[in-house]
Amino acid sequence: LTSEKIFSACANRIRSLSSFISTNDLLCAAKLICEARICHIIGAGNTIPIASDLGFRLQRNGQSCMYSSLPEQYFNNIALGDSSDLVIAISRSGASTQVLKALSLAKKKEMKILVITADPNSQIMDFSDAILQINDTNEMHDQNVRADSHLLELAVNDALIYVIKNYPLFNFDDKLPTQINDVELL
C-alpha cells in the first residue's frame, strides 16, 4: 500500500459520484439553496463537520445558513423557520434519529428538503424534495481496509459551491437570485 494507491483510490471514489449525481441534480440542488430564505444544514455524528463546512462556505458566498452540532439548536432553528426555508440533511445511513426528527418538523413547517445520503432505501428519502445520492464502498482498491471517510460528502459540498458560483456557465435561461454574489468575502 503506497501513498499513490491511497490517493488514487480517493480520486476514483470521487470520480464515481458522477454515476449517481447528474448535472441536473446539482443544478436542482443549487436552485433550492439559492431560492431559500435560510438554509438549515443538519447532520449527526460524523456528518456534523460536513454540515458545518457546507454552512460556512454557503455563508461566505452570500446564502443565509444555520447549522449547529447540537440537535436542540437545529430543532429550535427549524421550529422558528417558515416554508421559504430549506433543510439540507446530511446522513450517510439515512437513519440518524435526530436528523429524522428534524425533517419531520421541517415537513410540518412545509420547508423544502435536500438530502445527501448513501442509502436510497432509507427512511430519510420519505422527506426529500431533492436527493444527492452518494454510493461508496469506502474501501481501498485490492485491500480489505475500510477508510472511515466522508470524502464524498465533502466532494458534494465542493460541487454545490462550484455550481452555485458558476451557474451562468451552464447556459440556462434560469437565473439564480443575485444575493449569492453580494457578500464581500472577508
Where in this protein do the model-derived segments appear?
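Glycine-rich phosphate/diphosphate-binding loops that line cofactor/substrate pockets in enzymes
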Residues: N24-A36
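A ubiquitous structural signal for well-ordered alpha-helices
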Residues: C10-R13, L17, A29-L32, L54, ...
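A short, charged, Gly/Pro-tolerant segment at domain boundaries
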Residues: N166-L186
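Residues that form generic nucleotide/phosphate-binding pockets
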Residues: R13, L17, V163, K175, ...
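Glycine-rich phosphate-binding loops that contact phosphosugars or nucleotide phosphates
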Residues: C34-L169
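Short secondary-structure junctions and interdomain/linker hinges
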Residues: L17, I21-N24, H40, N171, ...
